[in-house]
């Protein structure tokens, strides 16, 4: 054990020798130094303090703030197994104070650390009883920041320089800290100008203005004009304008901006803020503006947000116009908004043949974003009439006797096939019911369409796939009576094969259990077939075959399980 410890110590010394004035290397050393005994720590810390004197202030403060954070972390999680003793932490604190920066402003930068890991030297430990530990530490953070800023002002240090360094070091809440603690929630033109000058990206400026604007004590229009006079940052300008809660479209800040700003504004993936007191015409104006300047996603997001503020007819009209938007940017939430809008429109217009057809066309347009079960109007159209389904067949499959492949048709078929394969429905089904007359009419028309397309050989295979999605019959067995009659009338080997395959595929993912579940399915399908065999022999034959398939599969799974043992 002694030899192993000696190796660790020598390795640490080797790392220290190679660290020189590299802050990153010293930070890595600090992460493991607590594992060594006191004399070794003292030796390493003394070397660290010496090397820090040779560093520039930027490097010094990185090391110093790392030590500060380790003190905070260990005192906060005081009961954790990996925690340092208070004796070691006091040593850390002592050594931290020995690291002196030439420009004292650097010592104030830690006040811009995030709320959730603000490096208090003496936080309330997480082990304390009570649920308000976070709130109490937040209060301590506020006191710390206020005290440090008071000291900063008393010593006459430059606020402009503090802002410059904080932005340079990429602290993320600079604007918020200045607004809340330095300006006490009030607008300070000098601070704003300094933030604009030092932060080219504009995030700190936005955070500063946003915090004060939320308190309602800033003239946003005046600030926007001031930013325009100082900066050419259009992104910052757009973000600031986005803070406005609009209640009057004529006087809205965005209304008077140029085309570029409007495009950036309406393409932002943030919810438009319209006052609850705004008149109906404000929402109508916003729809037009978003349609003209926004993206596919932001337009959908906006329609979703105001769906309760406009009539269903207006929502319907606005949704139909989405196909005119050229900016087709989408994100992970686009399908959520789309589904929410369609849920409303489908509920109101699914019985209106004209509007249902238009919505079905739009559902087809969005087929890459909507799941089949969400395309209720398209389902109704295809269940009521086979024309569209047949047209898809003509795109995907070759004509009888045709070997030539048209390249344009092949590319179109590739785009359509995956969706076509998801279209699972029973023709003419409505609310779980199917009538023989309607189903036969659909089947006959579909066969005639296939014949006219020179694809009649596909009839049995396609019909078998669709009929497998029949609802349950009045007697509690599958398929329903109307489908049984159609199977008896149009039965072919291809219909049987496709029906069996589709029915088995409906099972989906399942747990392997040595054939037990397959045996249960075998019995269930056998019982179903026995009930049908006298009156519907062809239909029963289909279910007997499914039963036999599961019986074979059950034996196979049982054998596999036994072989594993």
Residue ranges and their predicted role:
Residues 1-504:
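Non-catalytic all-alpha helical scaffold/repeat segments
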Residues 550-564:
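Amphipathic alpha-helical coiled-coil segments
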Residues 528, 545-546, 553:
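The canonical alpha-helical register within tetratricopeptide repeats
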Residues 494-507, 512-513, 562-565:
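Non-globular sequence segments
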Residues 514-526:
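Short amphipathic alpha-helical heptad-repeat segments
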Residues 526-532:
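Short, charged/polar, low-complexity loop and linker segments
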Residues 539-549:
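Short, charged, amphipathic alpha-helical segments
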């Amino acid at each position: 054990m002694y030899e192993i410890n000696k190796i660790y110590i020598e390795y640490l010394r080797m790392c220290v020798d190679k660290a020189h004035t590299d802050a990153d290397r010293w930070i890595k050393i600090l992460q493991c130094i607590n594992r060594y005994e006191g004399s070794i720590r003292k030796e390493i810390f003394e070397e660290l303090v010496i090397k820090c004197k040779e560093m520039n202030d930027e490097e010094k403060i990185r090391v110093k703030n790392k030590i500060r954070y380790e003190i905070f972390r260990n005192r906060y999680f005081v009961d954790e197994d990996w925690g340092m003793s208070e004796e070691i932490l006091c040593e850390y604190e002592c050594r931290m104070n020995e690291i002196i920066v030439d420009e004292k402003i650097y010592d104030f930068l830690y006040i811009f650390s995030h709320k959730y890991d603000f490096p208090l030297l003496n936080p309330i430990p997480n082990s304390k009883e009570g649920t308000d530990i976070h709130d109490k530490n937040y209060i301590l953070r506020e006191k710390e920041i206020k005290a440090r800023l008071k000291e900063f002002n008393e010593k006459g240090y430059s606020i402009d320089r503090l802002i410059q360094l904080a932005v340079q070091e990429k602290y993320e809440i600079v604007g918020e800290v200045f607004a809340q603690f330095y300006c006490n929630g009030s607008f300070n033109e000098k601070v704003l100008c300094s933030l604009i000058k030092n932060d080219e990206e504009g995030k700190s400026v936005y955070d500063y203005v946003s915090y004060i604007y939320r308190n309602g004590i800033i003239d946003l229009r005046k600030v926007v004009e001031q930013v325009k006079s100082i900066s050419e940052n259009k992104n910052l300008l757009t973000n600031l304008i986005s803070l406005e809660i609009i209640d009057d479209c004529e006087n809205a800040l965005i209304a008077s901006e140029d085309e570029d700003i409007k495009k950036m504004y309406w393409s932002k993936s943030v919810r438009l803020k319209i006052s609850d007191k705004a008149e109906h015409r404000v929402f109508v104006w916003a729809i037009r503006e978003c349609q003209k300047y926004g993206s596919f996603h932001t337009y959908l997001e906006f329609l979703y947000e105001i769906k309760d503020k406009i009539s269903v007819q207006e929502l319907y009209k606005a949704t139909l116009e989405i196909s005119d938007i050229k900016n087709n940017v989408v994100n992970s939430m686009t399908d959520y908004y789309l589904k929410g809008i369609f849920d409303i429109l489908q509920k109101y217009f699914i019985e209106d043949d004209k509007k249902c057809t238009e919505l079905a066309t739009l559902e087809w347009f969005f087929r890459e974003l909507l799941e089949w079960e969400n395309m209720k109007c398209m389902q109704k159209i295809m269940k009521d009439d086979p024309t569209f389904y047949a047209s898809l067949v003509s795109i995907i499959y070759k004509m009888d006797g045709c070997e030539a492949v048209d390249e344009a048709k092949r590319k179109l078929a590739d785009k359509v096939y995956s969706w076509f394969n998801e279209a699972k429905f029973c023709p003419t089904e409505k609310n779980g019911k199917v009538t023989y007359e309607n189903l036969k009419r659909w089947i006959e028309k579909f066969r005639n369409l296939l014949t006219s397309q020179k694809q009649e050989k596909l009839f049995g295979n396609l019909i078998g796939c669709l009929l497998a999605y029949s609802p349950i019959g009045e007697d509690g067995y599958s398929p329903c009576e109307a489908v049984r009659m159609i199977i008896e009338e149009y039965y072919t080997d291809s219909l049987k094969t496709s029906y069996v395959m589709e029915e088995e595929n409906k099972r989906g993912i399942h747990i392997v259990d040595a054939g037990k579940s397959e045996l249960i399915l075998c019995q269930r399908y056998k019982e179903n077939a026995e009930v049908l065999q006298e009156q519907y022999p062809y239909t029963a034959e289909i279910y007997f075959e499914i039963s036999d398939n599961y019986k074979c599969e059950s034996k196979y799974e049982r054998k596999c399980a036994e072989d594993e043992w």
